[in-house]
């Protein structure tokens, strides 16, 4: 019993040390929002949307914009600019779009890439491929295919698939 308790305490201490190290790395505001990381987030945020006029304006003074954002964040004076809201009709279906400004996308990307994803992804199941690097559409399709084949081997054609559609989920989330 003493050996088990000692082993439990050692493992508990190791888990706590690992958690403390992660908190030091991902929980420090100045580290997460360092100029270098904000600039990397800016580069990632403009990838694929360089044709937009707002992105081109931001890119024209990118160093000044990233520096200003960094200074506001460190000083505690950064404020969200809110959303651009507009309506479109896509494949005959009207949609209400809420889009954030490129400068806000940079901050969100920095927070996600250097804090939230590293901290939270350790608790995700392997099969979660939602917006994780290296786990895109092909990963999700291969996992579903594998699970369906496994189910078919065990149970034949008996069974069912549940499909959930979250309608207006973004509208119900608190944005303040």
Predicted regions and their residues:
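Non-catalytic, polymerase-adjacent accessory regions of viral genome-replication enzymes
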Residues: 1-67
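Active-site-proximal segment of RNA-dependent polymerases
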Residues: 25-28, 112-174
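Non-catalytic, well-ordered alpha-helical scaffold segments
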Residues: 36-39, 63, 67, 104-109, ...
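Intrinsically disordered or highly flexible coil/loop and linker segments, enriched in small
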Residues: 38, 51, 75-79, 153-154
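Short, conserved non-catalytic motifs in the polymerase core
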Residues: 48-56, 81-106, 123-136
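An acidic intrinsically disordered interaction segment
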Residues: 67-84
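Short, solvent-exposed loop/edge-beta patches enriched in aromatic
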Residues: 77, 103-105, 115-119
């Amino acid at each position: 019993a003493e050996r088990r308790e000692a082993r439990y305490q050692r493992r508990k201490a190791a888990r706590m040390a690992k958690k403390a190290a992660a908190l030091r790395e991902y929980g420090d505001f100045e580290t997460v929002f360092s100029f270098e990381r904000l600039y990397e987030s800016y580069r990632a945020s403009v990838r694929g949307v360089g044709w937009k006029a707002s992105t081109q304006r931001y890119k024209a003074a990118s160093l000044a914009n990233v520096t200003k954002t960094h200074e506001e964040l460190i000083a505690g004076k950064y404020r969200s600019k809110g959303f651009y809201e507009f309506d479109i009709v896509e494949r005959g279906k009207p949609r209400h779009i809420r889009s954030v400004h490129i400068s806000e996308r940079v901050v969100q990307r920095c927070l996600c890439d250097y804090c939230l994803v590293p901290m939270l992804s350790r608790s995700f199941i392997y099969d979660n491929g939602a917006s994780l690097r290296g786990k895109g559409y092909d990963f999700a399709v291969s996992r579903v295919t594998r699970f369906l084949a496994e189910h078919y081997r065990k149970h034949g054609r008996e069974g069912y698939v549940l499909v959930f559609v979250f309608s207006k989920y973004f509208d119900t989330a608190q944005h303040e």
